């Protein structure tokens, strides 16, 4: 989905839509939206939602994998506005050092990985691309603060040790998951994707948009 603001350059929506048949992490709460009041009967349409905070495009707070980590409302918002490098690594099983060692990362604080060509908005695919913990440490050493992926997690679906998540915690990097990068090519972009101020929250859905930089 593309957004155009006046005469400015085109913004691209990289957010997974939230709907009742969307792919959900196994065991998580399915997304549901319902009208609890209607215009006809109550004077206005008023809806409520039920969902996991990790449904769709979202930011993980450190509290997600650390009882003493920051909650989502305590994250520095400036990290989720600014330039981002988008890298294409399509059909890679795991992002490893050979995939990132030669990247030009001077001044790069945000990096997103596009790992697939087909985006299924209805079926959960457990064969997604993960990130090796060594890559996390490498990116942190280069000054990266935020890492995004079009996968639903940086660890495999059957990995209960969450090694990549804990590498992010140790390196003080932040994770954005389930990006919808179908209409985006590799390059430098402006990025906006702010979390909700959910007090004590372990994650938050975001509306993520990018536009190409010169």
Q: Residue ranges of each PLM-predicted region?
A:
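Active-/binding-site microenvironments in catalytic and ligand-binding cores
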Residues: 3-214
């Amino acid at each position: 989905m593309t957004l155009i603001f006046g005469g400015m350059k085109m913004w691209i929506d990289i957010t997974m839509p939230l709907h009742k048949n969307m792919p959900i992490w196994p065991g998580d709460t399915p997304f549901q939206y319902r009208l609890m009041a209607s215009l006809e009967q109550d004077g206005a349409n008023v809806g409520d939602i039920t969902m996991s905070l990790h449904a769709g495009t979202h930011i993980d707070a450190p509290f997600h994998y650390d009882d003493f980590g920051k909650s989502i409302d305590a994250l520095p918002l400036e990290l989720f506005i600014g330039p981002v490098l988008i890298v294409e690594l399509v059909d890679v099983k795991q992002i490893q050092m050979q995939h990132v060692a030669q990247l030009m990362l001077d001044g790069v604080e945000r990096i997103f990985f596009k790992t697939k060509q087909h985006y299924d908005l209805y079926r959960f695919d457990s064969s997604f691309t993960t990130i090796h913990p060594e890559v996390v440490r490498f990116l942190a050493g280069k000054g990266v603060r935020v890492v995004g992926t079009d996968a639903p997690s940086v660890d495999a679906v059957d990995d209960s040790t969450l090694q990549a998540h804990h590498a992010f915690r140790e390196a003080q990097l932040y994770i954005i998951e389930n990006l919808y990068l179908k209409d985006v090519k590799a390059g430098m972009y402006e990025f906006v994707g702010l979390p909700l101020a959910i007090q004590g929250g372990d994650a938050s859905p975001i509306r993520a948009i990018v536009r190409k930089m010169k």
